[in-house]
Amino acid sequence: MAKKNLIIDTSVFLSDANCLYKFHNNDIFLPIKVLEEIDKHKKRQDAVGQNARQTIRNLDLLRARGSLSKGVRIEKGLGLLRVVKASELCLNELPAGLSHKVADHLILAGALTVNKQYPKRKTIVVSRDINMRVIADSLE
């Protein structure tokens, strides 16, 4: 099966802190906005807060192995994890009506950026948010 680029939305991490380890050998890209959104939930005293804190710990373990902005192997047999910095985003690629001031739209700009950087690979937005998936599919 061909390797894919996966843009993982905040909603996925907040429901499964260990999701990074479930995407086989596909490469995972995290727009910096996802990290900011996860951080907003870490003080909650429920399952969402617990998942936010565990996600941050998982990312910190990977950060200790190398540069997240360059890409770090998640585990042997799994893909790379790379953070997409705000300065990399192709904001001019966002269609009319999508704003760089809306978190979901910045995450979608991350997907457009990765798609442009790796045109020969399929780029997929993974989200539990139905509207996010609908908008992402409309950008193809």
What are these regions (language model features)?
Residues K4-I124, I130-S138:
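Active-site-proximal, substrate-binding regions of enzyme catalytic domains
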